[in-house]
Amino acid sequence: MAAPKGSLWVRTQLGLPPLLLLTMALAGGSGTASAEAFDSVLGDTASCHRACQLTYPLHTYPKEEELYACQRGCRLFSICQFVDDGIDLNRTKLECESACTEAYSQSDEQYACHLGCQNQLPFAELRQEQLMSLMPKMHLLFPLTLVRSFWSDVMDSAQSFITSSWTFYLQADDGKIVIFQSKPEIQYAPHLEQEPTNLRESSLSKMSYLQMRNSQVHRNFLEDGESDGFLRCLSLNSGWILTTTLVLSVMVLLWICCATVATAVEQYVPSEKLSIYGDLEFMNEQKLNRYPASSLVVVRSKTEDHEEAGPLPTKVNLAHSEI
């Protein structure tokens, strides 16, 4: 069996550690054991090895060099794919074939190694497609469902602040309507034993009396339904009314804030820069016309250089003077 001569080239081109290349070189004697050793890191090459065994059976090819060269081509393709991170499989195949050319000098072994690179290519493509299918994908309706869940949480939290109550309407004997309002309370009654016959009869009589009373109250309530229909509607729909009011209030506040910011006067006043040509710039901005030289009158007085100023007035003592 010819030993591979391109270990230095493979280590230089692929950037592999020497320990990995040494393991790959020592694994040439046992194809199945080497495949199991590299499966955890470089991927599965068992399918490619089986294809090589079908291409180079031992009963047809008594020499094992071509079979081992084909299997080594499978491993070289996996190593190149691991180094290149599987970005371009065609480039990986070219690197694998170059490594086979450098590793083997005989044409039969080179062809077998190239065949191993070619056999590993479809399995690498299938594995890459499987990995891509396992990647999580976002559905098109996911943003809508997220907004809907957020809106439902906001509505639930808003309704939790609203206290519900029970309202009872009763009509007194004088025709006035009495309204009773209380918070809902849930009471769990214990298991009651079977009542005696006399207690059952008394309870039935009480129930019949309550039914008659409720029917009378209901009749009177229907008669006065037109007057208190609005109050009853408010009591039944108080939750939705308060929720709508809260949402509208928030929207109005946001609109007021945006309108105030948009229509506010700018408070920043740019500082004016001082310039020695300030008067000239002011005249240019105001578009003022200069006076012509002919309109200017220059008045000069004749003064002599030897002329001196006159004496100062004498001082007067105000204490000795009469005013």
Curated annotation (Swiss-Prot):
Disulfide bond annotation, renumbered to this chain: none
Coiled coil (UniProt feature): none
Q: How is it modified after translation?
A: N-glycosylated.
Instruction: Identify the keywords attached in UniProt to this record, alphabetized.
Output: Autophagy, Cell membrane, Endosome, Glycoprotein, Golgi apparatus, Lysosome, Membrane, Phosphoprotein, Signal, Transmembrane, Transmembrane helix
Query: Which Gene Ontology terms of cellular component type are present?
Result: Golgi membrane; late endosome; late endosome membrane; lysosomal membrane; lysosome; plasma membrane
Q: Where is this motif: ATG16L1-binding motif?
A: 263-281
| Residue ranges, Extracellular side | 36-238
What domain of life is recorded for the organism?
Eukaryota
Chain ranges on the Cytoplasmic side, renumbered to this chain: 260-323
Q: Which residues does UniProt assign to the signal peptide?
A: 1-35
Cellular location(s): Late endosome membrane; Lysosome membrane; Cell membrane; Golgi apparatus membrane
Q: How does it sit in the membrane?
A: Single-pass type I membrane protein
Similarity field = Belongs to the TMEM59 family.
Domain remark from Swiss-Prot or TrEMBL:
The ATG16L1-binding motif mediates interaction with ATG16L1 and promotes autophagy.
Report what the protein is called.
Transmembrane protein 59
What is the source species? Pongo abelii
